Design a protein with these regions (language model features):
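A nucleotide- and high-energy phosphate-metabolite-utilizing enzyme signature
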Residues: 1-9, 16-19, 23, 99-103, ...
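Metal-dependent nucleotidyltransferase catalytic core
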Residues: 1-18, 32-39, 43-89
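Conserved NTP/Mg2+-binding pocket subregion across the NTase superfamily
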Residues: 3, 61-148
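Short, mixed-charge, low-aromatic patches
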Residues: 13-22, 48-55, 80-87, 114-119, ...
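Short, surface-exposed loop and linker segments with low hydrophobicity and enrichment for Pro/Ser/Thr
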Residues: 20-21, 35-37, 149-156
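Short gly/ser-rich loop at a beta-strand->alpha-helix junction or flexible surface loop bordering the NTP-binding
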Residues: 24-32
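Conserved nucleotidyltransferase catalytic core and NTase-mimicking acidic/glycine-rich helix/loop elements
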Residues: 112-234
């Protein structure tokens, strides 16, 4: 048994105590199950219904979960989940790409995300990220440490952008690093830039002296992703 499954089983026990027969499915997803042992374990739980008393019960366990390196689970009513696939295509698409069933049925069986919903969400996410980088750079006043912090803290979001562009273009496979690199290739982003950002995604530290070197290429990479989405035709 994979080590993270023990923590997932404990979470299922906690949720079963709270929701009893209303608990329908639990899946694990995210960096931890893809090999990043330093990341907290993230899970999605689907239930028949969720009320204030359920939230109170979960809140009592928040500290316990944190101590055991469990992220607060994403808990949704099953029908709410089905109706929100078009509203959160990127978030659900990332779970769909790589997840493992822990309890109940796999909620992603026979689920598909419309490409146009994905394209629209990609455009919003990429252009918002581009504005964030430009504004952040101006706010830094050109100070290397501030630029380094901007690059490091935004690295996970950049990795997500690359994976979403790969998915938009039919990128198969569940391997996180391979899909991320595929997104970079589609946008013509140099492998070295993608490698640097992948490193930061897992270990958000960067020598201050490297910030000025990396930021211009990073900004150009996000601009390239925006062009890919603008010209996408399915």
């Amino acid at each position: 048994m994979k080590p993270w499954r023990h923590a997932a089983a404990a979470l299922v026990a906690d949720l079963t105590h709270i929701f009893a027969g209303r608990l329908r499915s639990v899946v694990a997803y995210g960096p931890h199950i893809e090999g990043d042992d330093e990341a907290s374990l993230t899970c999605l739980a689907l239930v028949d219904s969720i009320g204030m008393s359920d939230l109170d019960a979960c809140a009592q366990l928040a500290g316990h979960w944190e101590r055991h390196r469990l992220a607060i689970p994403l808990i949704l009513a099953e029908q709410e989940f089905r109706r929100s696939l078009d509203a959160f295509p990127l978030e659900y698409g990332e779970i769909l790409r790589a997840h493992e069933r822990v309890f109940g049925d796999d909620p992603f069986d026979q689920v598909s995300i419309r490409q146009e919903d994905l394209r629209r969400a990609c455009e919003t996410q990429i252009k918002s990220h581009l504005l964030h980088l430009r504004e952040g750079y101006i706010e830094s006043g050109g100070r290397p440490q501030a630029i380094a912090d901007l690059v490091a803290t935004s690295a996970p979001a950049f990795g997500s952008l690359l994976r979403n562009v790969a998915r938009l273009n039919g990128g198969p496979g569940a391997n996180r690093i391979e899909v991320t690199r595929q997104g970079g290739h589609l946008a013509g982003i140099p492998d070295a830039v993608v490698s640097d950002m992948l490193t930061l995604e897992r270990k958000p530290t960067i020598p201050t002296t490297d910030a000025a070197r990396l930021f211009p290429q990073y900004l150009a990479a996000v601009e390239a992703l925006a062009r890919v989405v603008d010209t996408w035709r399915g």
